[in-house]
Every structure is written in C-alpha cells, then in structure tokens.
C-alpha cells in the first residue's frame, strides 16, 4: 500500500550521513522523511567514540559553517577535547573530541525530532521505486510505499553486511543490527558498479577490570577548544582523561599464532580494509620490525564502564582476542564486554555520481556516506549534507550546490570520489588538499556560511553571529592598518620586549603583528595600543589573516591560473575516440570515468597534460567549449 502522504525528500538511513542529509533538506524547506530501521540508533557511533582529527576536524567545521549538526552535537557530548598539531601552522591544526556516545546519540535524536519539516519513520527500506530511470519513492520491509520527489541513500555498512569473528560469520549491518539484504539484492539489478569493502572494530573492555595505574594518562587541553562557531565551553559536559598503553612481543605472538583462523589471512574476507586504520593483525604483519604498537584507552562515556581500546581492531577468534588483550600492560585481568569483529559490505563506485552526489544513471537518486566507499563519521556527515541539500535543490528546481577543491575539504572529498573513485575505504587528510592554507578550520565559516545562507541551510541566528564577527574583523584590521607606532612611543620598551629585533622606524600595528614572534593579544595589552577585541574567533582571524597575507595571496593567484580550464564542461556522452592522438589507454580511462569537466579529467590517474591539451583543442575547434554557470 501507498502511504497517504508524499514527501519532497526521502532519506534512507539514520547514521551520520542520513542525519545531516535529512536536516539539510528540512532546513531548506522540503517536506522530508527519514526512514530508519531503528529510531533508537539514530546518530549511533558504531565504532570509535570520537569526532574530528587531522582533516576530519576540518570537515566538521565545514558542516557547522553550513548549519549542520555534527559540531554542535559533539560540543554538547564530548568528554575530552584536544587540538592536534597545535605547534604547527593554522592550516594543519585540527580539533578532536572524545565523545560520550550516549550523550551524542541523544543530542542527535532530540535535534531530529524537533526539526521543522522532518518526519521520522521506523522501517527498513527494501526497494527503490523507479519510473523511466527516475526514482519516485521507496518500499519498506512491510510493503508500505512512500512517494518521494528525490531519495538519498545513506545506508552505511548495512548493504549485504557480513560480520566476521574468526572463521564464523553472520549477516549484520553492525553488531546487534540486521543487514539490508533485500535492498542490496534489488540494487544489484540496477546499472551501478558495485564492490565490497571491509572495516573493523576492537573488543570493548570493562574499565573496572583494567589497571590504569600502569598506563600513561592523557588529559585533554585546557582551556578546551570548541567545535561549533556557535558553541562555547559552557556547552561541554564533565571532562575526563584517556590513557595510553602498548602491545608487546607476547601480544604479537598470540596474534601470529591465530592467523590460521583469521578471516583476513585465510581468504574468507574479500573486501579491502581501511589503509589508515589497519587491524592489529595487519599491523604486526606489515610492520613486523616493530616490537610494540600504541593503544589509546578511550572511555565510552560518563555513565558507562565500557572503554574503547583504540589500536587493536581485530576479527580474530574470541579466544585469541582474550589472549592478546590480557597480554597488554594494564589489561592483564581485562573483561571483554563485546568482541571485536570485521564487517564486509557492498559499496558503489562513486565515479558513477555527479559532483552533486546524484547518480548518473537514476535521476533524483543521491548517495552519501560509506555507500560511496568512505570511512569515518565526518566524511559521511559532509557527504550527507551536500546530498541532502542537492536533493532539496532538485525538488525546488534550483542549480546544484557544489564546492570546489579550493573552497572546502568537502569539495576535495567529493571531487576525489567522483573523479578518481576508490578501491579502499577513503579517509580525509589535510595532505589531500592542494590549498591547505585557504582551507583552515578557523575560516570554514568565512568560506561557506554565506553560500549556505543563499540556499537556505543557514538560519537567522547563525547568520547574525557571522555578520557580527566579520564586521569586528574588518573594523579591527582597518584600525591596525591605520594606527602607527613611533620608535619613541612612551611604551616602546614594552613593545620591543615582544620583538626579536627592536623597532628602528615607525610601523603600523599591522606591521608589528606580521612579525612571527608577535601575538595580537599580547601586543594589545600594551597601554595605548589596545584593547584587543573580545570575540576570540575574530581575534584569531585578525592574527592569521595578517601574518599569512602574502602566502594567502600567492595561493589565490595559483588558483586563478588553474581555474582557467577547471570549469570547462565536457559534453555528456562525448566520444573520445574522435580525437586523433589520444592513446587507447587514455580513451578507455576517460570513457570509464565520464568526467564532467576538464578539471576532473586532468585529475584522473594516467591522463597526461598532453591529452588534456588535445581535448581542449578539439572542444574549441568544434565549438563545444563552455564554462559551468
């Protein structure tokens, strides 16, 4: 039967991609349905209880700048905050937070339930309803059908999910949840390229059975950083410590002895696992020369005794898990509350997606999250927001909302996926971005909030706060440029005390702040030069923009040069064999990837600058050159 109401946007799956997708569509005014197999697991942290990190923290800030949920949710649920790379430049500094997974999940659910235009319904999705290569709705496990003008698939690891513990395996989307078998089978009959990936998780331990006195304590930063541009330290719950211990040779021997019963090393698991989050079996095999590996002992929350031993993800049999865990210092009497496991699942080749995350084969159908071959909550949330926004734009008959590699890590993420695809779970790093100095955590709102406002993602309160900040930055920078300090200033001794070399001639306050050793806040404490503005976000911008102005300008020039052909469109279904001079290999790669623009074509592995030149000449000669709007 058909449900009596129809929807603008239907989102299938309530994980990190699904929550951001449904909230984005609803914020933009679309009547949105979030379809989940279990309302109680909305926003569930299936693996590690943490948000952020190198590259990932940048994505969270960008989600927040566009009005998304993840940053606010972690600010209200994190039990430890740290700034990574704090001694390095602002481009690679990253925020990471340890979450209370119960608080996080509750905050997400509460936000979803109170979002205008959003309805939540509990039923697994078993099929997509198509008409003439266009999705028009979905069908659930009990046969109930929902009409939708656009559909976003955010099904995570649930498609034909297979959980492995030793040589035993069973169907599941994650421990305790059923796999999505029927939907996976239906989608295999559609024109999508599919493959299998694998990820894993460590056993969980009871903290009461551990000896923390022999471990290294790792406290959070004080004062603690804040993720959301709208947040404050007052949002944070109680802060507690994590701990560090290590594996040893005895641990490694237990693992080696169990490899003959490992699903990874006996060929039972076919999917490729995450390169940057390897299992402990992989670590001791690939890095056989290392006598120990670090383990971060991370509390799962304030009201539970469970801890997450980050660094020993495994799918070894349970008896081997027991032996390897109890061989670790501080874990000698450990009680395992949940076994570690690996999970294999279906994913779709993201090269079959447009930059908007819409399928190239089925109109109005969008994909986001692990279904596209990524790993991580942050990568999923970023894709979910973009997919949800574009599903809404499709309903409203608006242009697609896409971001370039020079605009956001979101742009880098989606461009990498849609252009290059992936054969292993894709994780974001700052090293993947060419324009890191422009794509900092601190300026995510400056880069994106105005764009989010234009399409309806950003509400009035955030928009007002953003404009106040920008006004503060501009007025203060004008003051710093126009305020001059003479070398006989009454406080010259205090000024020179901040400088490596004393002032030899007059200088503006801006000139002084450009010096690497000078801190804006310290300089403003000197009588007659300040006071510093109270807005800490604005003062951070003032310092970074002033100190790095030359480098930023050079990077902007570089972007302008590269953009000349970046946005040149390639006609759909273009026949590359028409171009004489292209090798068969190049033609095959271009046909396989179907790049939408010259920029995307240039980033395909094996496509040479000479091939791009031939393509440009042909398009120009035949009057096919045109830019994206």
From Swiss-Prot:
Key words of the record: Cytoplasm, FAD, Flavoprotein, NAD, tRNA processing
Pfam families membership: GIDA (PF01134), GIDA_C_1st (PF21680), SAM_GIDA_C (PF13932)
Self-association and partners: Homodimer. Heterotetramer of two MnmE and two MnmG subunits.
UniProt binding sites for FAD: 13-18
Similarity remark: Belongs to the MnmG family.
Known role: NAD-binding protein involved in the addition of a carboxymethylaminomethyl (cmnm) group at the wobble position (U34) of certain tRNAs, forming tRNA-cmnm(5)s(2)U34.
Lineage: Bacteria, Pseudomonadati, Pseudomonadota, Gammaproteobacteria, Alteromonadales
Domain of life per record: Bacteria
UniProt protein name: tRNA uridine 5-carboxymethylaminomethyl modification enzyme MnmG
Keyword Cytoplasm: yes
Cofactor: FAD
Gene Ontology CC: one annotated term: cytosol
């Amino acid at each position: 039967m058909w449900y009596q109401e129809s929807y603008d946007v239907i989102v299938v799956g309530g994980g990190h991609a699904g929550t951001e997708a449904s909230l984005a569509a609803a914020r933009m005014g679309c009547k949105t349905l979030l379809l989940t197999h279990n309302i109680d697991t909305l926003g569930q942290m299936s693996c590690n209880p943490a948000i952020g990190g190198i590259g990932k923290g940048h994505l969270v800030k960008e989600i927040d700048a566009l009005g998304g949920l993840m940053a606010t949710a972690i600010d209200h649920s994190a039990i430890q905050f740290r700034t990574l790379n704090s001694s390095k430049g602002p481009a690679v500094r990253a925020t990471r937070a340890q979450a209370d997974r119960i608080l996080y999940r509750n905050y997400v659910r509460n936000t979803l339930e109170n979002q205008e235009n959003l309805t939540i319904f509990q039923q697994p999705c078993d099929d997509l309803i198509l008409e003439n290569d266009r999705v028009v709705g979905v069908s659930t496990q009990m046969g109930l059908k929902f009409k939708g003008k656009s559909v976003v698939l955010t099904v995570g690891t649930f498609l034909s999910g297979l959980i492995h513990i030793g040589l035993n395996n069973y169907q599941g989307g994650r421990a305790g949840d059923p796999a999505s078998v029927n939907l996976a089978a239906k989608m295999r009959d559609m024109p999508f390229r599919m493959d299998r990936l694998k990820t894993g998780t460590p056993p969980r331990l009871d903290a009461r059975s551990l000896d923390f006195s022999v471990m290294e304590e790792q406290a959070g930063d004080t004062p603690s950083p804040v993720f959301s541009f709208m947040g404050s330290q007052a949002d944070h719950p109680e802060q507690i410590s994590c701990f560090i211990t290590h594996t040893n040779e005895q641990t490694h021997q237990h693992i080696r002895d169990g490899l003959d019963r490992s699903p990874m090393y006996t060929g039972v698991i076919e999917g490729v696992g995450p390169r940057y989050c390897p299992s402990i079996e992989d670590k001791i095999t690939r890095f056989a020369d290392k006598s120990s590996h670090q383990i971060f002992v991370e509390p799962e929350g304030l009201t539970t005794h469970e801890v997450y031993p980050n660094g020993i993800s495994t799918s070894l049999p349970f008896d081997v898990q027991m032996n390897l865990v109890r061989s670790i210092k501080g874990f000698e009497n450990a009680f395992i509350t949940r076994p570690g496991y690996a999970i294999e699942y279906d994913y779709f080749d993201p090269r079959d997606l447009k930059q908007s995350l819409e399928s190239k084969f089925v109109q109005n159908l969008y994909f986001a999250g692990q279904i596209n071959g990524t790993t991580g909550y942050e990568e999923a949330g970023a894709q979910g927001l973009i997919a949800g926004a574009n599903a809404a734009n499709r309903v409203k008959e608006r242009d697609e909302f896409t971001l370039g590699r020079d605009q956001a890590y979101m742009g880098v993420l989606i461009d990498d996926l849609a252009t290059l695809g992936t054969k292993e779970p894709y994780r974001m790093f700052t090293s993947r971005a060419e324009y890191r100095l422009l794509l900092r955590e601190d300026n995510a709102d400056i880069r994106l909030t105005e764009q989010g406002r234009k399409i309806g993602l950003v509400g009035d309160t955030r928009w007002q706060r953003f404009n106040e900040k920008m006004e503060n930055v501009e007025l203060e920078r004008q003051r710093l440029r126009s305020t001059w300090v003479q070398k006989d200033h009454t406080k010259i001794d205090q000024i020179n005390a901040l400088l490596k070399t004393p002032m030899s001639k007059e200088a503006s306050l801006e000139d002084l702040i450009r010096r690497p050793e000078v801190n804006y806040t310290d300089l403003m404490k000197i009588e007659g030069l300040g006071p510093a503005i109270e807005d800490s976000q604005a003062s951070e911008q003032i310092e970074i923009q002033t100190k790095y102005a030359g480098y930023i300008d050079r990077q902007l020039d570089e972007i302008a040069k590269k953009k000349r052909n970046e946005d040149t469109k390639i006609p759909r279904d273009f026949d590359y064999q028409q171009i004489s001079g292209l090798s068969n290999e190049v033609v095959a790669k271009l046909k396989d990837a179907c790049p939408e623009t010259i920029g995307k074509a240039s980033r395909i592995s094996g496509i040479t600058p000479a091939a791009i030149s031939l393509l440009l000449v042909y398009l120009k000669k035949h009057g096919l050159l045109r830019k994206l709007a």
